[in-house]
């Protein structure tokens, strides 16, 4: 399992990319988007940056996945997502970092 994510198009801002991926992969539109962290997943091998955003004020629409995307959308209560992470059922690094950040800042 993983949170919505994607590659930024040339000239696209990071927030615009986050909004587009959220809409494309989940059908959700955020009233507010706040960058919570930038991290480097593999410093020794690349200069890749990942920008994590907290989306709030969500409204539901229809997802619009790319032709080559195969999505299995599932909504989990936060406590269940924490348990899944602790059991090793969530292994995606950006998702784990995001869940840990949220747990740390929203007790």
Where are the language model's segments positioned?
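Unchanged
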Residues: 5-93
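C-terminal boundary of histidine-terminating zinc-finger modules
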Residues: 99
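N-terminal strand-loop-strand
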Residues: 1-3
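Generic C-terminal helix-cap and adjacent flexible tail
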Residues: 104-107
